[in-house]
Curated annotation (Swiss-Prot):
Record bears the keyword Repressor: no
Recorded topology in the membrane: Peripheral membrane protein
Positions bound to UDP-N-acetyl-alpha-D-glucosamine: 15-17, 126, 169, 197, 298
Cross-referenced Pfam families: Glyco_tran_28_C, Glyco_transf_28
Name of the featured protein: UDP-N-acetylglucosamine--N-acetylmuramyl-(pentapeptide) pyrophosphoryl-undecaprenol N-acetylglucosamine transferase
UniProt record, GO biological process: carbohydrate metabolic process; cell division; cell wall organization; lipid glycosylation; peptidoglycan biosynthetic process; regulation of cell shape
Pathway(s) per entry: Cell wall biogenesis; peptidoglycan biosynthesis
Originating species: Bradyrhizobium sp. (strain BTAi1 / ATCC BAA-1182)
Protein purpose: Cell wall formation. Catalyzes the transfer of a GlcNAc subunit on undecaprenyl-pyrophosphoryl-MurNAc-pentapeptide (lipid intermediate I) to form undecaprenyl-pyrophosphoryl-MurNAc-(pentapeptide)GlcNAc (lipid intermediate II).
NCBIfam families named in the record: murG
InterPro entries reported in the protein's UniProt record: GlcNAc_MurG (IPR006009), Glyco_trans_28_C (IPR007235), GlycoTrans_28_N (IPR004276)
Taxon lineage: Bacteria, Pseudomonadati, Pseudomonadota, Alphaproteobacteria, Hyphomicrobiales
Amino acid sequence: MTSSAPLILLAAGGTGGHLFPAEALGVELIKRGYRVRLVTDARALRYSGLFTKDMIDVVPSETVRSRSPVALARTALLLGTGTLAAFNLMRRLKPAAVIGFGGYPTVPPLLAARLAGVPSLIHDANAVLGRANRFLSAHVKAIATSLPGVLDRDPALSGKTTTVGTPMRPAILEAAAVPYAAPETAGPLRLLVVGGSQGARVMSDVVPGAIERLEPALWSRLVLTQQVRQEDMARVRAVYDRLKINAELQPFFTDLPARLAANHLVISRSGAGTVAELAAIGRPSILVPLPGAIDQDQYANAGVLSDANAAIRIVQSDFTSDRLASEISALAAEPVRLAAMAQAARAAGRLDAAERLADLVIKTAGL
């Protein structure tokens, strides 16, 4: 790769669900001899991975958090400032194409690309198009989705939409090579509980009580790994210590792909990235969609796996310690069912998404 190689700008919100697919595409484009840079917000600076600080451009941005006139005016001002900064970035870097991965931090660079005449496209990993991508969809040349049928009911957009899957970073592809081995009847049952990049308090509220309600014979089998917010750590640990559960508690896992592969059952939120990774690696799950979302994207995401009999979807209002204990007990008693769920999850996964998306980027850029 030389300094004269075409440059592709990757725009993503500053959370793992947006950054990880961007990273996976970046790896593939670099393999093909292209240069890449990331345009994002300040949150991305704390993530390690492909994008070092000298490969990241931070532009002003704001998420629509309120419909009040003052909040909307502030958001519009910041997005306008960000678009101007991104336009200057386009003039300086002269990218061959810009691709957005969702989140409001992608709005300024994608609008700037349109103003600068730079070919652009978006990728959406959700079963429902996100709000930022929905806004941008009319302004880009191409749309890539992880799942089929996302825009089938929108003739104006479906004609420029291609289903490619969710690009997987190298660590996920490595984990996907680990076959699923169902737990033996009296052997260890490895349970992983995660709640997204920030952790989910509901897991700390519900899971310890569910473990306490299991038959004592199952306590000795459990090997539990749980993501717990620091402020919840003491109360969660106290329950597991009292029950003598073999438990590892951490506020964040830097090696989550390997941990997904090492466990028999995963309890998690159903963000697009999590659902795609569970499918790619092929692991059974109990999914608890984040409530309150305007477009109910996590509910739809979880449905992709629950409809395939690869996961159990529980809405948060039904996610009680009693319900969870019942589900864990039933699955622990049916290792054959766990194996079938793992197989169904793997069948729903797609491991070549980064290659397919790279092909679309190159085609859109006319390279």
